[in-house]
C-alpha cells in the first residue's frame, strides 16, 4: 500500500492533462478551467446585481464578460510573447501568433503554448474600457463589480497549470515537494501552482468578497486587488522556478516579480486617483444642490 507522502510526491505524474478526445480533438483540463473560471465570475456577479442593488441589469455581466474573454485570450497571449517569449517571436512571428502549422499541402492546429496572467489582466482592462465606452457606463464601477469574484475564478486557472505539470516551483527538501515530469531534474519541487491557487485565489477571494459592500468609492476594490495579488504573487515567486528562457531578469528577481512590482504600483496609483475622482464628484454634486 502506497503511503500518503509517496502518493503526494508523485501526484503530478498520475494526472492526464487531457480529459477526453473526440475525433482526434483533445479536450483539456486547462481550457476547461478557463471556462469554469468565467462561469464563476459570471454567476457571482449576477448574484451581486440581484442581491446588492447594484446599478446594472441582469444581462450586463454576460455582455461585459464576453468582451473580457476576448481580452484575456488576446492579452494573455501577447503578454506572454512580450514578457517571456520575445526571442521566439523574432524567430517565428507567425507561428507564435497563429496556432496553426502549415506543411505538405495541409494545416494542423498546433495549440497555444504560453499565456501570461499580467498580459491577460491588461487585455481584460482594455476590453472592459472599450465596453464601458461603447455602453456609456462607468469603467471603475464595472471593474469593481467583477473584482471580488475574480480570485476564485483564478484559482481554477492555477489548478489547470498544476494538472498540466507546468509553472512548477524550485527544488526543495520539504516533504510537501512533488516530482514534476516536465522539470529538468528529478528532484522534489514546490507545488507553486497550488500555493498560488490558495493564496492568490482562495485567500484573496475571501478578503475581497468580505469587504465588497464596504468599498468607500468606485475603484477601491480594483486598486486593492492589484496591490493584494501583486504582493502575494511577488513572495510566492521565491518558491516558483523562473522561466528557463529568462532566468532572473533583474538582480535576483524573476520577470513575474518585476511585473508584480509594477502591478502594486498601479494599484496604489488607482487607489489615489479613484479617491480623488470620487471626492471631486462629491464636490460637484454638492455644488449642484
UniProtKB/Swiss-Prot annotation:
PROSITE patterns: LGT (PS01311)
Keywords, sorted A to Z: Cell inner membrane, Cell membrane, Membrane, Transferase, Transmembrane, Transmembrane helix
Record-level Gene Ontology MF annotations: phosphatidylglycerol-prolipoprotein diacylglyceryl transferase activity
Annotated transmembrane regions: 24-44, 70-90, 111-131, 219-239, 253-273
Uppermost EC category: transferase
Coiled coil: none
Subcellular location field: Cell inner membrane
GO cellular component: plasma membrane
Pathway membership, UniProt: Protein modification; lipoprotein biosynthesis (diacylglyceryl transfer)
Biological process per Gene Ontology, one example term: lipoprotein biosynthetic process
EC number from the UniProt entry: 2.5.1.145
Membrane topology: Multi-pass membrane protein
Annotated binding of a 1,2-diacyl-sn-glycero-3-phospho-(1'-sn-glycerol), by residue: 158
Coarse class of the protein's main subcellular location: membrane
Record family assignment: Belongs to the Lgt family.
Function: Catalyzes the transfer of the diacylglyceryl group from phosphatidylglycerol to the sulfhydryl group of the N-terminal cysteine of a prolipoprotein, the first step in the formation of mature lipoproteins.
Protein name: Phosphatidylglycerol--prolipoprotein diacylglyceryl transferase
Amino acid at each position: 500500500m502506497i503511503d500518503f507522502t509517496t502518493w503526494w510526491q508523485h501526484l503530478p505524474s498520475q494526472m492526464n492533462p487531457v480529459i477526453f478526445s473526440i475525433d482526434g480533438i483533445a479536450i483539456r483540463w486547462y481550457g476547461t478551467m478557463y471556462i469554469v473560471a468565467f462561469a464563476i465570475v459570471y454567476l457571482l456577479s449576477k448574484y451581486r446585481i440581484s442581491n446588492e442593488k447594484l446599478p446594472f441589469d441582469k444581462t450586463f455581466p454576460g455582455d461585459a464578460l464576453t468582451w473580457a474573454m476576448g481580452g484575456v485570450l488576446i492579452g494573455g497571449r501577447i503578454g506572454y510573447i512580450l514578457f517571456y517569449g520575445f526571442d521566439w517571436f523574432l524567430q517565428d512571428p507567425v507561428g507564435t501568433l497563429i496556432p496553426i502549422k502549415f506543411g505538405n499541402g495541409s494545416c494542423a492546429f498546433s495549440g497555444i503554448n504560453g499565456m501570461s496572467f499580467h498580459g491577460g489582466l491588461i487585455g481584460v482592462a482594455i476590453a472592459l474600457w472599450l465596453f464601458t465606452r461603447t455602453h456609456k457606463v462607468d469603467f471603475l464601477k464595472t471593474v469593481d463589480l467583477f473584482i471580488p469574484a475574480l480570485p476564485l475564478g483564478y484559482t481554477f486557472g492555477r489548478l489547470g497549470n498544476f494538472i498540466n505539470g507546468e509553472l512548477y516551483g524550485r527544488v526543495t527538501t520539504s516533504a510537501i515537494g512533488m516530482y514534476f515530469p516536465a522539470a529538468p531534474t528529478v528532484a522534489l519541487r514546490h507545488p507553486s501552482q497550488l500555493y498560488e491557487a490558495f493564496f492568490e485565489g482562495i485567500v484573496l477571494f475571501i478578503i475581497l468578497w468580505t469587504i465588497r459592500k464596504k468599498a468607500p468609492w468606485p475603484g477601491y476594490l480594483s486598486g486593492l486587488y492589484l496591490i493584494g495579488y501583486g504582493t502575494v504573487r511577488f513572495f510566492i515567486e521565491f518558491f516558483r522556478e523562473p522561466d528557463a528562457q529568462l532566468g532572473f531578469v533583474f538582480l535576483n528577481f524573476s520577470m513575474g516579480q518585476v511585473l508584480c512590482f509594477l502591478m502594486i504600483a498601479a494599484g496604489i496609483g488607482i487607489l489615489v486617483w479613484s479617491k480623488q475622482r470620487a471626492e471631486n464628484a462629491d464636490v460637484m454634486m454638492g455644488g449642484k444642490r
